[in-house]
Structures are given as C-alpha cells and as structure tokens.
C-alpha cells in the first residue's frame, strides 16, 4: 500500500510539473518578398510567446502600417542592416503617422535589422524594462528633412536600457533618445545628420560612451524639462565619445525644444545635475564644444528646477570650436573676441566646474528669467574641486549576455 501511494504521488507530481512547465522556446521565421510577408511579420509578433525568437530573413518588407510587440522576453533578430543583404523594414509607404515598431513589453532584444523612412519614430519602446537595442540601423534615406520622423530609437519610461552598436541618420528631433528612464547605457553607436545626435532627457543614471556624434545640429544633449511625469534628471556621464563637425542646420519642426539648439553644438547640458563630461574628443563644432545652460522658457510647473548643478567638464580634447556661434548675438561676440568664442560656453546659471585647459565664456545670466539680450559675455575661470566621481552604470548580466 505504501509503495502504491508513493507511485501515485510521483505520477501526480509528474503531471503537475508537465502542466506547469512553459512551452519550449521556439523560432518563428519570417520571409520577405512573399505576397503575405507583411501580415506574416505582424502575426509572428502577435503569436510569439515568452522565450521565442522572431527571425527576419534577408530582404525588404514594404510596410504600410506600423508593427507592435507586447509579449515579454522575445527576441527579434534580423539577417543584417545593410541594403541588399540585411533585413530591411521599409516604411516609405506608411499610411499613418505612428512609429515603425512599438514595443511595450519587458526583456525584449532587438538586433540586426534596419528600419527606414517611418512617418513617425523609427523604433519606440514604452514601459519596456531591460530592453536591448543592438546592431540596428534607423534611417531616413533622403537625409535631413523637417518631415522626417522625430526619433530614431526611442525608449521611454523604462528601467535598464541598453543601446549598443546602433546607427541613426536623419531624425528631425533626436537620433538616439532616452527619456524618463533609469539605469541607461548608450555605447558604440553612431548618430549623424540628426537635429540631436544623442539625447538623455529627464532620466536618472546614464552612461553615454564610445559613440560617434557627428554632422548633427547638436551632438549630445542632456536635458531636464518641466511638466513631465519624471523630472530632476541627474547622474549622467558623457565620456570617450567623438563629437565632431556638428554643422547640420537645425531642421526640427517649429515649437520643438530641440528647434532652439544652435547649429554647431557639441555637448549641451540644460537644467540637469551631477553630469560629468570627460575623455571626449571634440572638433569642428562651430558654436561650442560644450554648452551649460539653464532652462529659459516659460513654464507653469512649480516643482521644476531650471538650473544646471554640479556639472563637471574634465580631461577632454578640444579641437577647433566657437568660430560660427549660431545663437543670437553670437557672431558679434565672436567678432569682438578675434573671430571665435571659447570652446566652453556657460550662460551663467547654476554651477559648473571646468578643468579642461581651454577658455570658458560666461554670458552672465544667472537668473533664467533675465532676457538673453541682457547678456554680458565675459571670459571666466571655473576651476574648483569636483564632487566625487559618479559610479559606472551596471546593467543586469542577462542583458549584457545578449550582446556578447
């Protein structure tokens, strides 16, 4: 009797385990060029289960509608990003104004495909924790145009974000944008011919390193803006990037905050705190290599703090800068200073420490409500003892393993 009871118990345990076990992860392969290729692609994203991989074959999908993914722990993997050989999602004929791909689930891995010519954002993720953007190309192939989509890759309201080896060209706002998020790494990526190359906005704890931000209007922006659910951006490190020739005329639609970014801006820090800018290579940024400013626009947010605080600029290499300052009065200031302004420009609001052996120009506007036309540009020294260095951002090991 005892043996029979044990055998029955073992059988019940086996059945329970079988029922509780998740289905084995599978690969859903999708081919381009078939009559129903578009439907099969969206169907694969809908039917995918946690652990699955949606595998995109080489070829071009001519898409008229945006795609979406709302299943956790899914990989979307293509065959490459190059025209003629990779997996190309072409939205040139898109009917609506939405994004190309919208992700709203956790633990998603996007890798090795291209998204072209979306009417809205290229790839957007919202509330998608532990998301990885890897080896992607997002491009508006006709180059800078006001009618291009706003953002290339656009994670927002997320924790643990990795953007690695991504190429973005032609975004009318920011090529690589991370907003209202926490614990962020943007690395080994290229942003070119966007209004803002890379932008970290209203976010906490970010490392932006080993990127190339070239031929944008502004290379790398670190902003904090009012009237958003998450504000008080802080603890951002911008280091070991190449920030050069950011000379593209600003083509952002009027009314966007980035429409105010002067052509020729290298790194622009606005109203953030605890930001370190170090080890970067700057060259050929006509307005300034580094700008540090307060938020000088009308707002109705009583909790908003508009000043930059604890900004540290150190150990950077400065090439030519300040020879074509594109802000109001900039040309006159440059002429008065012999043809160029110093590589570092501070509006005089908040506080900053600049340890680089280059000139710093202050506009002497400590109150952000003071009109810009009351600026009194003066060379200044901003030496001092910086606060303790910010720590390196660590992402979950499971995220790093995906890109190894």
Tell me what each language-model feature is.
Residues 39-47, 62-71, 127, 232, ...:
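Short, T/G/N/S-enriched strand-turn elements that build extracellular solenoid repeat scaffolds
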Residues 77-79, 106-117, 129-142, 159-172, ...:
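Right-handed parallel beta-helix
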Residues 9-20:
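Bacterial N-terminal signal peptides
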